[in-house]
Amino acid sequence: MPLKLSLKPGEKFVLNGAVVQNGDRRGVLVLQNKASVLREKDIMQPDQVTTPARHIYFPVMMMYLDEVGAEKFYEEFATRLNEFMGVVRNPVVLQDCIAISKHVMAREYYKALMLSRKLIEYEDERLGHVSSGVSAGGDAG
């Protein structure tokens, strides 16, 4: 099933590791086969990895963007997820953590990434952090 991306003028996204930027008008991109696509709003820079949930999101994002080299990021992901689960008591959040782990084990990195975003939202609510680069919602896949 094709993936249709509606792009804002100048919007950047990563497509199979390449940074691509839309022109000066709105545009539509239709991907006919499987590809790793991540919109600019979903990309976290290393300097934005400042909280435990972001320490989970970042290696999942890297696994998604670099599936061939995913094992380089797995240990960091597993360590950080384990630490996070050790301090969280909310059963819904713990279920999300388990689901993230299952998605990563199945190499379903985009699904894991979108669930990881929920951890950031939970953390922001609890800790009162201002969002730092990863917005809620998303429509790339």
UniProtKB/Swiss-Prot annotation:
One of its GO terms (molecular function) is mRNA 5'-UTR binding. It comes from the Bacteria. One of its GO terms (biological process) is bacterial-type flagellum organization. InterPro entries: Flagellum_FlbT. Belongs to the FlbT family. The gene is flbT. Has a post-transcriptional repressor function in flagellum biogenesis. Associates with the 5'-UTR of fljK mRNA and promotes its degradation. It holds the Pfam family FlbT. This is Probable flagellum biosynthesis repressor protein FlbT. Keywords: Bacterial flagellum biogenesis, Repressor, RNA-binding.
